[in-house]
């Protein structure tokens, strides 16, 4: 290929599904003859939401919810055409967001 590196960035709310997706990508790339760097764990985004439990008063009674977004980075160095075809056909778990940069 003309490009020497494919960068894959994965995001998910559950780290187990994210790790299985990263494991599938790494296994597919190494099986087809490409060099893989990663998966590199990136910082986890933590969103915290605070709401009042009561509808009208009792402001001291609050409840907090948090949402964590886990991220991984996988670099595929010197990919072949066979590697790209295998990655396009790869079936990843639902709930994993994939961003690919060539």
Curated annotation (Swiss-Prot):
Pfam families: Ribosomal_S10 (PF00338). GO terms for cellular component: ribonucleoprotein complex; ribosome. One of its GO terms (biological process) is translation. It comes from the Bacteria. InterPro entries: Ribosomal_uS10, Ribosomal_uS10_CS, Ribosomal_uS10_dom, Ribosomal_uS10_dom_sf. GO terms for molecular function: structural constituent of ribosome; tRNA binding. The keyword Kinase does not apply. The keyword Ribosomal protein applies. SMART domains: Ribosomal_S10. Keywords: Ribonucleoprotein, Ribosomal protein. Belongs to the universal ribosomal protein uS10 family. Part of the 30S ribosomal subunit. NCBIfam families: PRK00596.1, rpsJ_bact. Involved in the binding of tRNA to the ribosomes. This is Small ribosomal subunit protein uS10. It comes from Streptococcus pyogenes serotype M1.
């Amino acid at each position: 290929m003309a490009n020497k590196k494919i960068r894959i960035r994965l995001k998910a709310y559950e780290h187990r599904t994210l790790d299985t997706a990263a494991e599938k990508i790494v296994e597919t790339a190494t099986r087809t003859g490409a060099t893989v760097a990663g998966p590199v764990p990136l910082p986890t985004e933590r969103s915290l939401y605070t709401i009042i439990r009561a509808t009208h008063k009792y402001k001291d009674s609050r409840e907090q919810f948090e949402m964590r977004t886990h991220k991984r980075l996988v670099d595929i160095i010197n990919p072949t055409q066979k590697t790209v075809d295998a990655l396009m056909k790869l079936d990843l778990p639902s709930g994993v967001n994939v961003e690919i940069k060539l």
